[in-house]
Amino acid sequence: MSGKACLISCSDHYDHRLRAWDRGLRQLHYSTKYLTSDFDHATKVPFVCTVPGCVQIHVTPYQKNLSIQRILSHYQFAQRVTAYLETEQPDVIVALLPPNFLAQSLARYKRKHPNVRLIFDIFDLWPETFPSGKSKWLLSPVFKVWAYLRNSSLPAADFVSTECDMFRDILHLGANSRAVYFAAEPTPVASLPDLPEDHLSLCYLGSINNIIDIPRICDLIRSASRMRSVRLHIIGKGEQQQEFIDAATAAGADVIFHDAIYDAAEKQRIMDHCHFGLNILKPSVCIGLTMKSVDYFRHGLPIINSIPADTQRLLQQYGIGVPYDGDCAAKICSISLEENLAMRHQAKLVFEEKFTEHVIQHTVDCILNEVVRCL
């Protein structure tokens, strides 16, 4: 097998999602090109991609996630990517969704070039993941259009992979689909738990944004602090970080704010002093697995979980945490050191069995062998 392949991500998720597809295609002797925009959608500034051979597509900058400028930027990316593909004429296309404009453009390209193999990888279910509220109600007509752009385009793909099985169920995907979980490398240092006995130590890891459920986290802290003193380690940052710190402190937690930490050994050191990781999002958020969950498991930290579907099943099957419910505070305050260590052991095993780069690479390789074998 040999040919040309294009991998596409508007928001530059090469490391999180596309690296495995790139490796798999190269193993099948495809030459690959990676296409992304020249605008960082998180920091809202232009950037230079460091992936070797990357082709960056110029788009209009924007500052607000809900704005006409963002819609225009995503539309430009979809149109300019398609124009590039007309010149490049690849044999295989792997595209991350959203943006949903990209799904529509690539579906049209597939109909025009039926011999190309098209794979959609859905890493976010937009607009379903938008937190509920007045804005979602007001924007529901627009959101329906956005969802239609994606849903009407999926049948054009030869294969659809999703971030979690929950997305497959919601989209009613069939046999030509499969969940491909987030991949991560094992931590470079061993976990050496040193859990405090005089207080309950919790960890929050990740972005502090509008989808985390600060009120429910604070309710948990408030209930637990009636039984034991509570310390909260925050590893991350975001637009709501001060609100989170203030609310957790008011609820009774001794808050230690570490800011964002990218060094795995440093994160391991902090988590070795924590009993549980917080995996609590707003109920309206449509997601079955978070990157923070994988990172908690990577470090051997059991979780307090409100996420349904995939993550809930992992808790039930492997005993790697406690579900967020009315008895949650009492449960986490009464769990013994031995029980916590057993959960930590299980969390590490789950990571090694389901989320290492080796495991995810095998999944991707199986998909590629099936989808491109006829080329």
Labelled PLM ranges:
Residues 242-268:
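Nucleotide-activated donor-binding/catalytic signature segment of Leloir-type glycosyltransferases, i.e.
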Residues 212, 258, 263-269, 277-295, ...:
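Nucleotide-sugar-dependent
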Residues 23, 79-83, 101-104, 108-112, ...:
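Membrane-proximal helix-turn-helix segments that form the acceptor-binding/catalytic region
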